[in-house]
Amino acid sequence: MNGCLQVASGGHKGPLRKLFKKVDGKMQMIDLNDEPFPETDTFVEVKKGSLVLLHGRLPHYSCENTSLKSRHAYTIHVIDNNNDYPEWNWLQRSSLPLKSFIND
């Protein structure tokens, strides 16, 4: 069985509840808010070859893929060049520096 993508409708409007942070070279999930996540109430069937865009704060979930067919997912994180991006962020890696789409 290939689990269906589920999202919490309107969940992106709530507070940031958790974030990933590098601590001593290891990734940890940090709790920021005790407010429970909203229920994932919307099933999003995604056909092969589709593109799905999710807001960074949208709670989403997918059950484990137990089928014999792989379910590939590629993630692109877009960050405004004018924002301060903390060194402790889990995406910041000296071995793989972030690249800009714009030549300054």
Can you name each region flagged by the protein language model?
Residues M1-L58:
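Double-stranded beta-helix
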